[in-house]
């Protein structure tokens, strides 16, 4: 009996190993593409993106392949953000998360039920690589808020850019807790890295994105939420069996705003919003800019503020408004444009209008009124004869 149990356990272990090996296999949808092409063919995944150049929206879209973006938090907003950037052809993505995929996550976008049990970064990397094998995916499965992991996070975002030893081009915060946001804020203030913060409310009907430039705009510690300002432990706020609401629509909209502004920043087109909110109840989209707090608790934020104030201010060159010059300076024929509602001084009788420019003559003269028109224009004489008298006159004829 013991031998049979041992054999069954060995078979189970072998099957588990085979399953893990199969799950570890990363599917590849196509071969890598060396250069983006604007050729409009069904086999070109970049033709619609490169059309932005033809329409003068982006000068050189292929520059996106030289960009590295770090995404912290691969949940409802972060996974969709990674998906969008991958489809846009970003050069490199660095994913940070320590959570696992659960069936409770299926109300959100991106993840599938067969990925339950996998780490979020691992599941995301496999799907993203299958979507676009041209994008390099780097994963880190740890909590960035611990001391050791924070140092690893700091070294990664400052040295794992597209070029070895260079910082990432942008950090995107898609986490769902203030502790992680403060960790990202501290790292970006210390290394003077621009980053976007994003979030969705607990009732799932509002979201926001915020662009933070150390020293120029308010950092996350300049105006902290109450839970941070009062040093409250977030874990004590969550009751057992109670969870925040989650709508894939709100998360998709927030992720769309986040990626849209990230692309504008990376490819230098359009205007990047410093703060953009969204209220789903009345479709309200507030925009604002938050100035840094001179009494911020983050010493690196205060240092960046001093550095920013010491920088020479960019000189704004005011372009002269173009003057409305006539398209054709010479007007030999005396032609003028008259507004439709302008009173006309021209005579109504064309036969009297013979004042034409030099070198022109009338093709014909307007005819005089015919005798028929003159007869119609004449006024009939007034007669007091009654209808009975007229009938009698007609019968006598």
Swiss-Prot record:
Q: Which UniProt keywords apply?
A: ATP-binding, Metal-binding, Nucleotide-binding, Ubl conjugation pathway, Zinc
The reply to whether Nucleotide-binding figures as a keyword in the UniProt entry is yes
Bilayer-crossing regions: none
Q: Which GO terms describe its molecular function?
A: ATP binding; metal ion binding; UFM1 activating enzyme activity
Enzyme active site: 243
| Region annotated Disordered, chain positions | 343-384
Q: Does the keyword Metal-binding apply?
A: yes
| Annotated positions binding Zn(2+) | 219, 222, 296, 301
Instruction: State where ATP binds.
Output: 76, 97, 120, 143, 177
What's one GO BP annotation on this UniProt entry? protein ufmylation
Q: Name one GO cellular component term.
A: cytosol
Describe its function.
Answer: E1-like enzyme which activates UFM1.
What is stated as this protein's family in its record? Belongs to the ubiquitin-activating E1 family. UBA5 subfamily.
Q: Could you tell me what this protein is called?
A: Ubiquitin-like modifier-activating enzyme 5
């Amino acid at each position: 009996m013991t031998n049979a149990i041992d054999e069954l356990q060995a078979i189970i272990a072998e099957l588990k190993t085979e399953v893990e090996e199969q799950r570890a296999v990363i599917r590849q949808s196509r071969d890598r593409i060396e250069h983006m092409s604007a050729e409009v063919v069904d086999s070109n995944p970049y033709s619609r993106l490169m059309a932005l150049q033809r329409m003068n929206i982006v000068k050189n879209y292929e520059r996106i392949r030289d960009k590295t973006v770090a995404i912290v938090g691969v949940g409802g907003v972060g996974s969709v953000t990674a998906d969008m950037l991958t489809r846009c052809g970003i050069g490199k993505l660095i994913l940070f998360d320590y959570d696992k995929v659960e069936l409770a996550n299926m109300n959100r976008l991106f993840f599938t039920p067969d990925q339950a049990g996998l780490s979020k970064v691992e599941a995301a990397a496999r799907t993203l690589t299958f979507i676009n094998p041209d994008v390099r995916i780097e994963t880190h499965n740890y909590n960035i808020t611990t001391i050791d992991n924070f140092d690893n996070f700091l070294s990664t975002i400052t040295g794992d850019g597209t070029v070895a030893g260079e910082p990432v081009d942008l950090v995107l915060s898609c986490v769902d807790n203030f502790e992680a946001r403060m960790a990202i804020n501290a790292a970006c203030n210390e290394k003077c890295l621009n980053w976007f913060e994003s979030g969705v409310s607990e009732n799932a009907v509002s979201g926001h994105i915020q662009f933070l430039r150390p020293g120029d705009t308010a950092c996350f510690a300049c105006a902290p939420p109450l839970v941070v300002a009062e040093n409250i432990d977030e874990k004590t706020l969550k009751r057992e069996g109670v969870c925040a609401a989650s709508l894939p629509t709100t998360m998709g909209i927030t992720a769309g705003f986040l990626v849209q502004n990230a692309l504008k920043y990376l490819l230098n087109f359009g205007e990047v919003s410093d703060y953009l909110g969204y209220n789903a109840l009345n479709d309200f989209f507030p925009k604002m800019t938050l100035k840094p707090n001179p009494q911020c608790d983050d010493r690196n934020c205060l240092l960046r503020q001093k550095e920013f104030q010491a920088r020479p201010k960019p000189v704004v060159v005011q372009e002269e408004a173009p003057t409305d010059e006539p398209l054709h300076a010479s007007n030999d024929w005396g032609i003028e444009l008259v507004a439709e509602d302008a009173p006309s001084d021209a005579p109504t009788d064309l036969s009297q209008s013979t004042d034409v420019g030099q070198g022109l003559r009338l093709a014909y003269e307007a005819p005089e009124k015919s005798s028929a028109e003159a007869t119609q224009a004449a006024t009939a004489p007034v007669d007091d004869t009654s209808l009975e008298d007229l009938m009698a006159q007609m019968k006598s004829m």
